[in-house]
Amino acid sequence: MDTKPGDAEAKPGKTEDSDFKVTPWEVTGKVDYDKLIKRFGTQRISSAIKRDMEKIADGKLHVMLRRDIFFSHRDLDLVLKDYRDGKGFFLYTGRGPSLGMHIGHLAPFVFTKWLQDVFGVNLYIEITDDEKFMRNSDYTIEQVGEAARQNILDIVAVGFDPDKTFIFKDSEYIKNIYPLVTKIAKKINFSQVRSTFGFDPSTNIGMIFYPAIQIVPTMFENKRCLIPAAIDQDPYWRLQRDLAESLGYYKAAEIHSKFLPPLSGIEGKMSSSTADSAVYLTDPPEIVENKIMKYAFSGGQSTVEEQRRLGANVDVDVPFQWLYYLFDDDDSEVERIRSEYSSGKMLTGEVKKVLAEKLNGFLGEHRRRREKSPEMLDKFMYSGELAKRMWRRIYE
């Protein structure tokens, strides 16, 4: 097993600053990602790592890597070494079910699919229905169950390999993992979860116990686990990295993304609770266009004359940032828009229309694939090659 410096020194998961706050449940303010790397004790993805991944991917690096959307990591270099040495690795990610998935929820799954396609590895997707129920006092068990089903249909539509992907709900699979959950829970004390997650006397005991459940999938195989996720999820894996080797497993490796900003501005991250700041996977084309034209924060000037003269600030312009984040993978086209918009040659309305067209194309393709998701659901959860093996296993 490998021990990397810096794990013990990493700051608590509740990261606050005078300008921004990042926890697994809340992101506010304009995030300084350089400062967050230092606070969390992670590493920036180097050009050398990108070159390695580009070589493995036959020169086709994913847009979210090329543009530093996935920007930080823990032990990604060791994952790549294991892959080159023939040891392999596996992928693990998850979803806390909500009553409506938006594009910010889907983006990490799109990147995860690329990883599975390039490396040909198994993927485990945990649906944390138990955690969602315990954390949200206004959710019933029935609501969480329906949200989980709908979210799984959206995840299936991303196009993962059904024989190398296992999607499971905690509430169903708990009997297969509970022996290992208890071993993990025994190694974590209340002081650790309180300092990591900011729990207080009002926190229910389910939430205090839950981190032990979320750690288990990192131990599904006797290989290194790579977790693609937004950087706000890092605190869970610091706990895992503290205890994994004592149980005979590898420390989890991670690759972290930046947040897709809400329509309202570049501060914080998109939230399902604010309808006008998010674009949902179910939004029809006219609603998508209306949201972008009406609500997307612009870095352009207030009049056409000023825009022609001064240009836009693309660093705070949400339509441009969304194009850059994922929704236009043509680097030369994005740079053309950056140049013409920032110089005043392009107007705000023109950039918004480009985004609306790109985003509606993305969502239209997703909806077409989702129509076939119900017939694939059983294979991902129960009858696919990996799923069948997983239901036969008990983790002790």
Question: What residue spans do the PLM features occupy?
Answer:
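Divalent-metal (Mg2+/Mn2+/Ca2+)-assisted nucleotide/phosphate chemistry catalytic cores
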Residues: 135, 140-257
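Divalent metal-coordination and catalytic microenvironments
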Residues: 102, 155, 232, 267, ...
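A short glycine/serine-rich beta->alpha loop
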Residues: 95-101, 198-202, 225-229, 307-311
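N-terminal catalytic cores of NTP/NDP-binding nucleotidyl/phosphoryl-transfer enzymes
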Residues: 59-132, 227-229
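Structural motif
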Residues: 171-175, 200-207, 307-317, 346, ...
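Non-catalytic terminal extensions that flank enzyme cores
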Residues: 1-95, 165, 241-293, 299-302, ...
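Short connector loops at secondary-structure junctions
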Residues: 126-139, 260-263
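Short helix-capping/linker segments at secondary-structure and domain boundaries
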Residues: 120, 219-226, 326-337
